[in-house]
């Protein structure tokens, strides 16, 4: 069995910070559509020229921010991969994530350019969604943190009965692409 690739956690954390800074700079209550307009422009540019990601790799997680689903059973895998700095191979990765159908052309273009970068960007999105943002949260006791975490995940209960069902608007049939 080939040795697993390593995730570069320091790079992922740097990408997370840079992506979050970009997201924050456009997330302004006075211009509520600014982030949406910015990400829409980025998607078009990156889809046309994924090589741009060499100089601005944080733009991919910004472009996909809030538009990727991590099924509840997959979150444990992502937590493990990040804790052990293990990069999943494509077959492991593709079943732990759901991209919005509208983003598929971009996702496929980036995958063709750099599968590793796509996986890294999804690790960034996982961290943004599950660890909170780059800015430190107000200090609280450990007990408060634990109770808050439970409420943060109320939307992702494990008793979802949609196992095997498709969620409208999300795509998870990558094997079909290769046929």
Swiss-Prot record:
Composition bias, Acidic residues: 144-179
Domain of life: Bacteria
Description of what induces expression: Part of the atcJABC operon. The operon is constitutively expressed, and expression shows only a very slight increase at low temperature.
Region (Disordered) location: 133-179
Phenotype reported upon loss of the gene: Deletion of the gene does not affect growth at low temperature.
Role of this protein: Part of an operon involved in cold adaptation.
Designated name of the protein: Adaptation to cold protein A
Organism name: Shewanella oneidensis (strain ATCC 700550 / JCM 31522 / CIP 106686 / LMG 19005 / NCIMB 14063 / MR-1)
Lineage, uppermost ranks: Bacteria, Pseudomonadati, Pseudomonadota, Gammaproteobacteria, Alteromonadales
Gene name tied to this protein: atcA
């Amino acid at each position: 069995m080939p040795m697993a690739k390593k995730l570069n956690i320091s790079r992922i954390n740097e990408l997370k910070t840079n992506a979050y800074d970009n997201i924050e700079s456009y997330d302004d209550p006075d211009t509520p559509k600014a982030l949406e307009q910015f990400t829409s422009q980025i998607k078009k540019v990156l889809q046309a020229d994924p090589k741009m990601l060499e100089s601005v790799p944080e733009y991919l997680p910004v472009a996909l921010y809030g538009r990727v689903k991590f099924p509840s059973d997959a979150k444990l895998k992502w937590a493990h991969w990040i804790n052990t700095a293990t990069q999943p191979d494509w077959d492991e990765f593709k079943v732990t994530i759901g991209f919005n159908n509208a983003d598929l052309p971009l996702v496929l273009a980036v995958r063709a350019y750099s599968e590793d970068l796509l996986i890294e960007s999804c690790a960034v999105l996982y961290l943004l969604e599950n660890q909170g943002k780059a800015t430190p949260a107000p200090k609280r006791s450990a007990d408060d943190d634990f109770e808050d975490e439970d409420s943060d995940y109320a939307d992702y209960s494990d008793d979802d009965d949609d196992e095997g069902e498709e969620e409208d608007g999300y795509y998870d049939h990558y094997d079909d692409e290769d046929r």
